[in-house]
């Protein structure tokens, strides 16, 4: 019950951040299209800082085992759910924005502050495992779908700052190299902006939308159902039958972290990707807002269901 209450509080905070972005546009201080600059800052600066900072922990056998369990669970979720969502896309004729909004969760913005508040900072590393795995898919699958590219540009993928940050973070962890306190504190400070900055972008885009048109669009409610109900239930079944929680003394907590990452609203980074590559960013933002609103109810209930099942 404590986790469920903290979840609701964290999501409520995200809505206040969205409202701030909304107000700054409605007040005439900025235009909704100005959010594109902030989107690039989030994608190429703030998220890499989150990743690098998360891997600055001591190397121990227990930590490595926990990382392997979290990685296995995260990879299982990403691979199986990708096939499942792709199948749903063909059956229900989902477009590029809808497919990516259903598949990609808002783990980067919500899971880190949530895990910090509920479990403590020592567990943030494991939440970043899921985020790192998702980022690889995000900069390959999502980028290809949103940008409508015919093939993968592997050179751009490998040289992407987010992918580089993942490999550098892993290297620093396994070699035991610790960054100077000044650098690490800077990474932490910049990384802590990921939630507020992403939500402000969403609010700025939302301010330029027609509210009646958004909530009159029945497709949004169906996409919300897929993102917050169908996908989480599939994930719950996968985690249950995989028995990954039995592989570590901290297994149940690690599985909880991965499940939390899966059941979050649609990724705000999909909106940012749409902005950067010229897809329908307003529709993506509308899906993000509606799923975030609905997740106030769905996330606490799903966590309670997980605790009953495991």
Place the predicted regions along the sequence by residue:
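Alpha-helical transmembrane segments of multi-pass small-molecule/ion transporters
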Residues: 1-310
């Amino acid at each position: 019950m404590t986790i469920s209450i903290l979840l609701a509080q964290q999501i409520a905070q995200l809505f206040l951040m969205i409202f701030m972005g909304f107000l700054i546009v409605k007040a005439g201080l900025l235009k909704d299209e100005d959010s594109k600059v902030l989107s690039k800052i989030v994608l190429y600066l703030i998220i890499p800082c989150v990743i690098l900072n998360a891997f600055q922990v001591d190397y121990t056998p227990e930590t490595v085992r926990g990382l392997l369990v979290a990685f296995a669970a995260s990879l299982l979720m990403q691979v199986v759910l990708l096939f499942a969502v792709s199948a749903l896309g063909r059956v229900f004729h989902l477009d590029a924005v809808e497919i990516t909004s259903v598949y990609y969760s808002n783990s980067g913005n919500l899971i880190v502050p949530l895990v910090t508040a509920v479990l403590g900072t020592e567990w943030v590393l494991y939440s970043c495992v899921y985020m790192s795995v998702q980022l690889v898919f995000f900069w390959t699958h999502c980028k290809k779908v949103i940008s409508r590219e015919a093939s993968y540009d592997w050179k751009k993928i490998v040289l992407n700052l987010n992918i580089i940050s993942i490999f550098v973070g892993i290297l620093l962890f396994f070699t035991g190299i610790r960054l100077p306190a000044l650098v690490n504190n800077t990474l932490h400070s910049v990384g802590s902006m990921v939630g507020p900055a992403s939500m402000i972008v969403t609010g700025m885009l939302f301010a330029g939308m027609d509210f009646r048109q958004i909530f009159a669009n029945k497709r949004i409610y169906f996409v919300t159902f897929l993102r917050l109900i169908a996908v989480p239930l599939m994930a719950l079944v996968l985690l249950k039958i995989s028995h990954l929680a039995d592989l570590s003394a901290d297994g149940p907590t690690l599985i909880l972290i991965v499940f939390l990452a899966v059941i979050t609203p649609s990724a705000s980074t999909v909106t940012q990707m749409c902005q950067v590559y010229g897809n329908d960013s307003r529709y993506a933002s509308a899906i993000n807002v509606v799923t975030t609103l609905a997740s106030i109810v769905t996330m606490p209930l799903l966590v309670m269901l997980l605790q009953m099942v495991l």
